[in-house]
């Protein structure tokens, strides 16, 4: 009986230690150590459409990456798509939980539906969201926030910290949230942040990123008190990060983590590219970045349809699931 109790105590201790490594502080402090020869390998698991949040499903990009390389990324991100709504909240939540349980650093994107009633790229009038009193646009967006807050609470109750991006590319005027410019884009980000924080959702590492447009990071920056991770998209052959020096200053002066929030290493019309170009660019131009997250949607963005993917993921400078 005593031996059984000892074994149980050890198992509980090990379980607790595992959870302690998944707290917000533990994960964020770890991310701060990256860069300069050690870079996080991330991958979008799902974007929108019908990419299944279960990492073992054939449509999930974590499965596709592993099938191609035999290696799992360290960071994986699932999108809660409220525009098309192809899955239930329970399916998205369970997808994030499976990532967490398998040892991934879990990310969550939101793709909020247009609160004015149109599609994701339809015109909007957003000021009513911030007005006193009730109105239909405000009610719609608050309903969506309540829905997502309930999901975040479920994740918190299950001991899961996530890197959360409330608005994908905050400056992207193809999307409804940016159609009225930086003023309301910033207000939306701050609103979600404050609303979730007041609900006690302290399992969130707050991520902000923009398109690769020059100057977008400064123009749309919500503020130091609202952002933990600053990111930039980079698509095509350039592998650019225009505001790198500004971002490095934020890293040094305000303790921010900086990375490529979205990365696609070539266009569809281009010939397959050597994946090691990413590592070369990091080492020679952007060594302060903590890493990157490859885009999904199609293999030409990531290691699946480019050259030396398995070798690239096995490189000791890249942090994958088994190399921490």
Feature annotation, model-predicted:
Residues 1-22:
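Bacterial Sec-dependent N-terminal signal peptides
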Residues 84-202:
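Substrate-binding cleft of extracellular glycoside hydrolase catalytic domains
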Residues 47-58, 80-91, 140-144, 211-216, ...:
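Acidic-and-aromatic substrate-binding clefts and catalytic sites of carbohydrate-active enzymes
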């Amino acid at each position: 009986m005593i031996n059984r109790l000892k074994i149980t105590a050890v198992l509980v201790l090990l379980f607790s230690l595992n959870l302690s490594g998944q707290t917000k502080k533990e994960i964020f402090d770890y991310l701060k150590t990256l860069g300069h020869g050690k870079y996080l390998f991330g991958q979008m698991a799902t974007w929108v459409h019908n990419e299944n949040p279960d990492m073992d499903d054939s449509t999930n990009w974590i499965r596709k990456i592993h099938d191609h390389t035999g290696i799992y990324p360290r960071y994986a991100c699932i999108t809660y798509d409220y525009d098309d709504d192809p899955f239930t909240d329970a399916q998205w939540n369970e997808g994030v939980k499976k990532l967490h349980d398998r040892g991934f650093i879990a990310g969550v994107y939101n793709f909020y539906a247009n609160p004015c009633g149109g599609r994701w790229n339809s015109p909007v009038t957003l000021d009513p969201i911030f007005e006193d009193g009730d109105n239909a646009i405000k009610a719609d967006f608050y309903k969506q926030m309540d829905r997502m807050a309930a999901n975040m609470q479920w994740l918190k109750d299950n001991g899961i910290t996530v890197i959360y991006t409330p608005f994908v590319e905050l400056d992207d005027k193809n999307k409804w949230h940016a159609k009225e410019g930086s003023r309301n884009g910033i207000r939306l980000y701050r609103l979600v942040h404050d609303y979730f924080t007041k609900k006690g959702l302290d399992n969130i590492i707050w991520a902000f990123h923009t398109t690769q447009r020059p100057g977008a990071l400064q123009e749309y920056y919500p503020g130091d008190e609202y952002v933990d991770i600053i990111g930039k998209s980079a698509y095509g052959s350039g592998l650019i990060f225009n505001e790198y020096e500004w971002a490095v200053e934020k890293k040094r002066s305000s303790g921010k983590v900086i990375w490529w929030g979205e990365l696609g290493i070539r266009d569809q019309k281009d010939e397959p590219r050597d994946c090691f170009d990413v590592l070369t660019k990091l080492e020679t131009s952007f060594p302060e970045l903590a890493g990157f997250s490859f885009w999904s949607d199609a293999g030409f963005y990531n290691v699946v349809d480019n050259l030396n993917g398995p070798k690239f993921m096995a490189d000791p400078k890249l942090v994958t699931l088994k190399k921490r």
